[in-house]
Swiss-Prot record:
This is Autophagy-related protein 11. Belongs to the ATG11 family. The keyword Membrane applies. It comes from Scheffersomyces stipitis (strain ATCC 58785 / CBS 6054 / NBRC 10063 / NRRL Y-11545). GO terms for biological process: autophagosome assembly; autophagy of mitochondrion; piecemeal microautophagy of the nucleus; protein transport; reticulophagy; ribophagy.
């Protein structure tokens, strides 16, 4: 049996609590509040405010998960509250008996009978004292619990206010920092300097075009942006500073509230820290027990002297018992007084917290206007800040335009190279490789039919035929011009390098060069990745290049040895590709055999040939270097010059890297000019760095020598392996020669790197010379600085002399001002005394007239608000009608509600699923205009507040400020009264009173036509709405029948789709076609007999079948299965070589899926 859990409810004003067992039996927050209303005796549930621990508002859906709820009365949070409400919480319904001293031992009799009777009476008094003290103890403990509960309630409401304030303050601070950042980095004052510097930039040449960076900017637009920012940015900053001051004041007031609560808590600790209730009650119980024990001992033992017991009780026990009881009673009174004080002072705390929240609510509303789009007419709004940001961005182009233009050049070149490789390297190679695969299949089928076709003709009269698909891979779409500012200019890599040098030599920021170099390196990396993809695609055809005899040999060898020689496969594929390329070359040379004479086409391909990339430089006749990896021999190489072209591209990349390194060194040299104070130290560090580099060079030479020895040893091993390989497989000797040439090429690269290193050393030497020249420049600048300091001292002495003269003149003027001000004060005092004598009577009459005028104005304003609220309710009725497809119309003088189609399509913009409101400012009904006309009298009252003149003071302060009234103010009061009477007569007492006309129209009781005659629904709007609901209910029944029919059709379609094969977006339950596939493994595996099966897909690669039983797929060419589970895997650097985690030898970063499927039989 489990223990019950309870929800504890605390009254925040009295500290009392009650418990409710969980789960809570109330079904809604309203029911729960009505229960609390009966407990707290509150007149309305709207006055209840509920909080949970840590200042969180009550979420009724989680009420069974809570332990505590604090209940507050909203009536005590206002600036003015009803004292009766507070007295309701401070009233105490219990009283305690004040202890009285014992009178039983006051007698001085010595008779044993009288002494015995007195002792028994004293024992009864002690028992009564103990009983009263026990009751007082319980009440005191209850008061302690109540005080602690009130303190917890104060902490809870303070945490609630703190959370509310901090949330708004956090949002405000983020926007304030944003505005401060704009103000700090604003360029509206200094943009002209940057613009002039940009104008000094020389033209940059790209091909035959010259580009002036300043031409991209519009001077008039820049001037307009600067003017707009200068006129509006200070207003925005001032607005946010004002809001920041308000938030700071709220923070200070919040600290004051916190200190007030802390002071109350410390006061309670200091007042009651010396009283220990448990020890006090222990003393009382002990004394009472001693009195009782003595009497029992006297009655049981005659040897005890009665007079001594009497004396002990009279002088010790009874006085001590009385003193402790009085101390307990005083402790109780102190607790009750402190609780009453705490309850009253907590009201001021609640009021302060409410005021803080109101201030933060105003901050929140102002912040919402400034940070979200709205229709506010305030000159400082969200649109203003956005416009300032846009103009600041445009002004920043004066500084960032060189960097932006460089990014545009690099991106245009990167897109060009990507498109060039994709269209000419990838697409064309895919087409060629697919054609090669089809040719291999044609050859295999031809051989197979040659061997077994005759036997098939014996079984059937039909001649066996075969057909294969044709492949046509074409590039659809044209290149899109992304950057219009460059027009049709073709950007080369050399142009980018020249532009980086152009920026470095200009007055642009030094970070621009670093960023441009980084983006340029990213361009090279992107192009190299496309090259790798092209090489991979170029080797696809080799996987199907083995003949039938070779396949049978490899399969038999696999049975014997358990593995396949992938090198042999690659070499065979290479030979087949060379033969095919020689055949194509022969066809190309002699394709025009009908024309005479026949000539070889030795002319280099033109720039329009779509088989070559435009970014590859002219080819050089060099020997093709061998590949260290046999797989790379599958790269498309029709002639030797193709490899030399790739080699030249690599050399170009190396030259570019060296040039970028030189640019970086120049940048470091230019930075040395600004490092005046640390120049010598930088020079020493540079020398030390050169020494370290020399040591590193020596170490690299040693490492290079060791690597070269290892390479020579590996080369000897490879030569031996190739010799054995050549003997076994009769490989062409050209492969060995290519490997030897590659080694020679590596030696040439090493020598070239040594030359580059010597070139860098020469550059360091020139840098040392430049440092010496800079030192001389710094010494001359220091001399000029000393001359400037002497000139500054002379100017300061002249300024100090002028300040002494001005101070003397200022002192004389100040003395004259003091004399004149004293005379003015005397005259002012005489004038005020005179006015007090003559204005006392007139002031009282003026104040009476002013009070009456204020009453009239308040009544008219209240009637105006009442009429506006009635009109808003009428608009709400119109919104409700139109959301239901009904429209309020007027036919002649009769009002009707008619059914209109098309109104429900006008849905709200904020919530497209909400069909209850229409997203327009005003409903479509024309009757609203007539009702609005009848409210024209409201505009007359709208200016009543402006009629009032400035009142010197209220009636309570009339005697203090009576000297400020005069005859002119009296005339103003009278004229004001006449105007109010005129307005009242015009609206309410004229022949055709406007107010009566408005009431007659807005009531809709005359000249109305009901939708249907009904004795129950005779109201105009209720009648139309009830009829509309009945129509909708009938439509819903018909719609339900149609939905059932549609559901039956959907079930039929789902049954049909269950037998369709899925090709992408595989999910559990899909029917999938699995085909055996071949995985190119980078490493040899022990068990190659396992056949991988891949799902037939379109755009969803790497879905492999989980084969638990090899007999399941044995001797099958395909399998159809229903997916039972899909396990996602990813190849990482850690599991790339693990066959259990990467059984299909996929590349690092590839996500593949292991599919468990149940075979379906049809």
């Amino acid at each position: 049996m489990t223990d019950l859990s309870y929800l504890i409810i605390y009254n925040a004003h009295t500290g009392t609590s009650s418990r409710i067992p969980k789960p809570i039996r109330y079904h809604s927050l309203g029911d729960f509040k009505r229960f609390l209303q009966t407990q707290l005796h509150v007149d309305s549930i709207d006055n209840l405010f509920l909080l949970t621990s840590f200042g969180i508002k009550l979420n009724f859906g989680l009420i069974n998960e809570l332990n505590e709820v604090y209940v507050f009365d909203k009536r005590l949070f206002g600036n003015s509250y009803d004292p009766e409400v507070l007295s309701q919480y401070t009233a105490e319904s219990f009283e305690v008996v004040k202890p009285t001293p014992s009178t039983a031992l006051a007698s001085t009799e010595t008779q044993i009978r009288i002494i015995s009777s007195s002792l028994k009476s004293n024992q009864g008094w002690a028992r009564a004292i103990v009983q009263d003290c026990h009751h007082t103890e319980e009440l005191a403990k209850e008061l302690v619990r109540n005080i602690n509960a009130i303190f917890k309630s104060l902490n809870t409401i303070f945490q609630f206010a703190t959370n509310f304030i901090n949330e708004i303050e956090k949002n405000f601070n983020s926007y304030l920092n944003y505005i401060k950042l704009i103000n700090y980095k604003t360029l509206h004052r200094t943009w002209i300097d940057s613009y002039n510097i940009l104008k000094q930039y020389p033209p940059f040449k790209i091909k035959d075009a010259s580009v002036f960076l300043v031409d991209f900017l519009n001077h008039d637009k820049l001037l307009e942006a600067a003017n707009y920012v200068s006129s509006n940015l200070p207003l925005v900053v001032s607005k946010f500073n004002g809001m920041s001051e308000t938030i700071n004041s709220v923070g200070e007031e919040k600290l004051t509230v916190d200190k007030e609560i802390e002071s109350l808590r410390n006061g309670s600790i200091n007042e009651f820290k010396d009283v220990n209730l448990s020890e006090l009650m222990a003393k009382i119980y002990s004394l009472s027990r001693s009195i009782t024990n003595d009497l029992e001992q006297v009655s049981n033992n005659d040897s005890i002297k009665l007079d001594e017991v009497y004396k002990e009780h009279k002088e010790n026990y009874s006085p001590l018992l009385y003193d402790n009881a009085v101390e307990l009673h005083n402790y109780f009174l102190g607790l009750r007084k402190f609780k009453e004080k705490l309850t009253k002072q907590s009201v001021s705390i609640f009021n302060s917290i409410a005021n803080l929240q109101m201030k933060m609510v105003s901050i929140k509303s102002n912040l919402k206007t400034l940070t979200t789009p709205s229709e506010s007419t305030d000159p400082i709004s969200f649109e203003t800040i956005n416009t300032i940001k846009k103009y600041e961005d445009y002004l920043s182009l004066n500084i960032d335009l060189p960097l932006l233009f460089g990014f545009v050049l690099i991106e245009k070149r990167r897109q060009f190279e990507w498109y060039d490789f994709y269209s000419k390297g990838i697409v064309n190679n895919v087409s060629e490789q697919l054609s090669t695969i089809i040719d291999h299949e044609k050859l295999f089928r031809k051989i197979w039919l040659r061997k077994f076709g005759n036997f098939l003709t014996l079984l059937s009269d039909e001649t066996p035929t075969t057909s294969l698909p044709n492949i046509d891979v074409t590039l659809v779409g044209i290149k899109e011009e992304t950057f219009k500012i460059l027009h049709d200019i073709q950007v080369e890599r050399s142009d980018i390098v020249n532009y980086i040098a152009f920026v470095e030599s200009s007055k642009a920021s030094k970070n621009f060069v670093e960023l441009l170099n980084k983006n340029f390196r990213d361009l090279i990396r992107s192009t190299n990745n496309m090259k790798k993809i092209t090489r991979v695609i170029s080797s696809l055809g080799t996987y199907t290049s083995l003949s039938g005899e070779e396949k049978s040999k490899i399969l038999s060898k696999e049975d014997e040895e358990g593995e396949i020689d992938f090198d042999l496969n690659l070499i065979k594929g290479l030979k087949t590709r060379i033969k095919k390329l020689e055949s194509l070359l022969h066809q190309q040379q002699y394709k025009n055999l009908t024309s005479w004479p026949v000539t070889r086409n030795n002319v280099a391909p033109s720039s329009s040939d779509n088989r070559l990339s435009l970014i590859i430089e002219p080819q050089k006749k060099t020997v093709t270097p061998p590949k260290s990896d046999p797989k790379q021999l599958l790269q498309k190489q029709s002639v030797p010059t193709r490899t030399s072209s790739a080699q030249s591209a690599v050399l170009d990349s190396t030259n570019i890297d060296i040039r970028l390194e030189l640019i970086k060194i120049k940048k470091e040299n230019t930075e040395l000019i600004n490092e005046n104070s640390a120049l010598h130290q930088s020079n020493d560090e540079s020398q030390k760095l050169i020494k370290d580099l020399r040591k590193e060079i020596e170490e690299l030479k040693a490492i290079n020598a060791s690597h070269r020895q290892e390479a020579d040893a590996k080369l000897l091993m490879k030569e031996e392996e190739f010799r054995l390989f050549k003997l076994d497989n009769k490989v062409d000797t050209k492969l060995v020669e290519n490997l030897e040439k590659k080694v020679e090429q590596r030696d040439a690269q090493v020598s070239k790197l040594k030359e580059d290193l010597s070139r860098v050393m020469e550059i360091n030497t020139t840098s040392d010379k430049e440092i010496i020249a800079l030192n001389s420049t710094i010494s001359s600048m220091r001399n000029e600085l000393n001359d400037t300091v002497v000139m500054k001292n002379d100017l300061l002495s002249n300024i100090s002399a002028k300040e002494v003269e001005h101070s003397k003149e200022r002192n004389g003027l100040e003395n004259e001002i003091k004399t004149l001000s004293a005379k003015v004060d005397e005259l002012t005092e005489d004038y005020e005394n005179l006015m007090e004598i003559t204005q006392s009577r007139q002031k009282n009459a003026d104040l009476l007239v002013n009070d009456l005028n204020n009453i009239i104005i308040k009544l008219m304003n209240d009637m105006k608000r009442l009429a506006e609220n009635i009109f808003e309710y009428f608009l709400e009725f119109c919104f409700v009608l139109e959301s239901m497809g009904l429209l309020l119309t007027m036919d002649g003088d009769v009002y009707k509600i008619t059914r209109v189609k098309g109104l429900r399509s006008k849905k709200t913009v904020d919530d497209p699923n909400d069909t209850s409101f229409i997203s327009i400012e005003k409903p479509s009904s024309k009757v609203i205009d007539e009702v609005d006309k009848s409210m024209s009298w409201v505009t007359t009252i709208s200016n009543l507040s402006s009629i009032l003149p400035e009142v010197p003071g209220t009636s309570s302060t009339a005697s203090e400020n009576g000297h400020e009234s005069n005859e002119e103010e009296s005339n103003k009061f009278n004229s004001q009264s006449l105007k109010l009477i005129t307005i009242f007569n015009e609206i309410f007492t004229a022949n055709n009173a406007k107010f009566e006309d408005f009431l007659r129209i807005i009531s809709f009781q005359e000249n109305v036509q009901l939708q249907e005659d009904s004795a129950h629904n005779s109201k105009f709007f209720l009648n139309a709405i009830s009829k509309r609901f009945r129509d909708v209910e009938g439509f819903a029944k018909r719609q339900t029948k149609e939905n059932k029919i549609k559901e039956q059709e959907i079930h039929k379609l789902v049954g049909r789709l269950a037998t369709k094969i899925s090709m992408n977006g595989f999910q559990i339950g899909d029917l999938v076609l699995f085909l055996p596939t071949r995985i190119d493994r980078a490493v040899e595996v022990a068990n190659e007999s396992i056949q991988p099966w891949a799902a037939f897909n379109i755009g969803a690669p790497h879905y492999f079948l989980k084969v638990d039983d090899e007999e399941r797929t044995k001797n099958k060419e395909w399998m159809v299965g229903r997916v039972e589970s899909i396990e996602e895997n990813k190849v990482t650097d850690e599991n790339a070589g693990d066959l259990s985690s990467n059984p299909f030898q996929l590349s690092v970063g590839v996500v593949w899926y292991l599919v468990e499927a149940k075979e379906e039989h049809f």
